[in-house]
Amino acid sequence: MYFELAKRNLKRNLLRSILALLGIIIGVAAISSLGILGGGLKQGIMENLGSISNYIIVFPNYQNGYTSFDKRDIEKLRVLNCKVIPVYATSDFVYIKGKNRKAYANIFGIDKNDIKYLNLKVKVSDTSVAVDTFFSNVNDVNVGNQLEIKNISLRICGIYNSTFLFPDNSLILTAKTYRRFYGENNYNYSRIILYVKNINDIDKIKNETDKILNRKEKKCIIISLNSILEAINGVITKVSYFLMGIGAISLLVAGIGIGNVMLMSVVERTTEIGVMRSIGASKKDIIILFLYEALILGVIGSLIGAFLSLFFGYLIVHYLLKTSLSYYAIFYMIIGIIFGILTSLISALYPAYKASKLDPIKSLRNE
């Protein structure tokens, strides 16, 4: 009964109801879309950087005069429950055969048995070199092309994606090949990468590394990539909630619109309310009737707004961020729907209460 009466009353002033409905749709779409956008950003970061969360990078502390690590430092770290990967690094010009030009690049040297732990999906031999996507695109080279370093030719054996471990414009050689170019007796490493199989041991390994290498003085800087990811995700989460809060302002405006519609309805339906009260309708019945009207507006507007947010969220995440919708999209849609319905009901409380307080005799006398 309540539902049918509420539906009839909303149809009576259809244009006014549609305008109130639009406010809810826009508000819910804004809240959900901004939440989905934040979720998409986190998803994109995890897709691009999640593969490096198991790594710790150890750099020399240049401020204290340390520029490299030696064999003794490496051996000290072998006791840790992780894979210790010493890395050579320098910058130099390489000659691109067939292009008749040189290119400047960051060159890394890693033991060929350690490369498999770096999730680069390349296999490098002592006669080959791997290049990152940036170097490949800028210099128009691909697998099979030849690079020349120190007048020695190396075949490009693979292309890997740049990460925090190996930034843009980089090449990877085996440690043996690197020493061939930059000193056979060169065992001074520019950095150390620690691969921790169990991500839950990251903090423990980081602390143990600090105790081993920084026991006497600050010899190195230790960076946990997992902690960087957590910090980035934390910032994005806070920004997402802030943006959702801004979106909630439009929902507040929509709530005011619904309250206004309901108050006007009370004035217009004074006689009708008086008739209902005179034939036995209680104050509770009047309140429930108005809340049903608000509920219908809230449910319809929230559902439309939520699905619009899913549509626009997909377009933004897929085409702009180049990633996929996360499972959080449903969560933000539900949050938007709940807020939309609650806003509608809360906005109708005062008009419903005012309608229930109308004196039936005075209402009929006005007619």
From Swiss-Prot:
Q: State the Pfam families in the record.
A: FtsX, MacB_PCD
Membrane topology label: Multi-pass membrane protein
Positions of transmembrane segments? 18-38, 239-259, 296-316, 329-349
Q: Which InterPro entries match?
A: ABC3_permease_C (IPR003838), MacB_PCD (IPR025857), Macrolide_Exporter_MacB (IPR050250)
Question: What is the annotated localization of this protein?
Answer: Cell membrane
Has the keyword Transcription been applied to this entry? Answer: no
Cystine pairs annotated here are none
Q: Tell me which UniProt keywords the record has, alphabetically.
A: Cell membrane, Membrane, Transmembrane, Transmembrane helix, Transport
Record bears the keyword Membrane? yes
Query: In Gene Ontology terms, what is one molecular function of this protein?
Result: transmembrane transporter activity
GO CC annotation: plasma membrane
- Indicate the family of this protein: Belongs to the ABC-4 integral membrane protein family.
Q: What is the protein's given name?
A: Uncharacterized ABC transporter permease MJ0797
